[in-house]
Amino acid sequence: MEIISDKAAMAARSEAVRREGKTIAFVPTMGYLHEGHLSLLKRGRSLCDYLVLSIFVNPTQFGPNEDLDAYPRDEERDRKVAQEAGVDVIFMPNNEMMYGPNYQTYVALEKLPYHLCGLSRPVHFRGVATVVTKLFNIVRPHTAIFGEKDFQQLAVIRQMVKDLDFGIEIIGGPTVREPDGLAMSSRNAYLTPEQRKDAVALYNSLNQAQEMVSAGGKSAAAILEKASETILAVPGAEIDYAKLCDPATLDDVEAIAGPTLMALAVKIGSTRLIDNKVLEP
């Protein structure tokens, strides 16, 4: 396994791999890898000849007063996880490499970012779309794998790849969960032991919503009211959003008429957690 920090060297390596007729799978991350990331890497390993992992805590997707400086980092552990997954190259650029002096070009979508997380994090998806565009141009993968836990991010990237003719296959990897159902996330490291127990309320509310839909429930208001009750029973929990929406457009729905995305963003203490589930009637 090789570690590359220079973007020209990464581009040259990808070009050499392509000249050999090999296919490249790419998993972009911000590091602090967990079993969810490992599942994406294993998927990439199974799909292509060559596997690239990027680790870059992207400053442009964090707004003021968000957790950029506090975001957890553990390079040694990340390297072990990457080795276990069969990664060929870890691309680890720094801020100066990705955003040089007088940097002024950004990628922004018109509609998808202005739902769900974008309502409270207005610059987030501009930063995501920009850094992913740059990484795609450097790594030049045939396939890229993203987690379905970040459903809106996956939707934004799929739309961007389609609109801008990247010619890259985008694959979503299922959410990987702890034994009690909590979605794996690097930010889970912020939780105290008590908050960690309480955080399973997100998963429980999603399951309750599916039970209501399976029993014939169609009212979005009723489903969301029940979810809010479950979450707000947790001391100190604060709901950023709880939404039922069209999985394709992310527009809110008032009634369940087919597969419907339920998406949650909740603060447990100071830690913001997200989760989602596509509810099936």
From Swiss-Prot:
| CC per GO annotation | cytosol
Q: Which reaction does this chain catalyze?
A: (R)-pantoate + beta-alanine + ATP = (R)-pantothenate + AMP + diphosphate + H(+)
Task: List, alphabetically, the CDD domains matched.
Answer: PanC
In the Enzyme Commission scheme, what number(s) does this protein have? Answer: 6.3.2.1
Positions that bind (R)-pantoate:
61, 153
UniProt binding sites for beta-alanine? 61
Q: Check the record and name the Gene3D superfamilies matching this protein.
A: HUPs, Pantoate-beta-alanine ligase, C-terminal domain
Location within or outside the cell: Cytoplasm
Q: Where along the chain is ATP bound? A: 30-37, 147-150, 176, 184-187
This protein's superkingdom?
A: Bacteria
Task: Give the Pfam families listed for this entry.
Answer: Pantoate_ligase
Q: Enumerate the GO terms in the molecular function aspect.
A: ATP binding; pantoate-beta-alanine ligase activity
Q: Identify the enzyme class.
A: ligase
Q: What are the catalytic residues?
A: 37 (proton donor)
BP GO annotations: pantothenate biosynthetic process
Pathway involvement of the protein, from the record: Cofactor biosynthesis; (R)-pantothenate biosynthesis; (R)-pantothenate from (R)-pantoate and beta-alanine: step 1/1
Subunit relationships: Homodimer.
Q: What does this protein do?
A: Catalyzes the condensation of pantoate with beta-alanine in an ATP-dependent reaction via a pantoyl-adenylate intermediate.
Q: Which HAMAP family match?
A: PanC (MF_00158)
Q: Misc remark for this entry?
A: The reaction proceeds by a bi uni uni bi ping pong mechanism.
What family does this belong to? Belongs to the pantothenate synthetase family.
Which named protein is this? Pantothenate synthetase
Write down the species: Desulfatibacillum aliphaticivorans
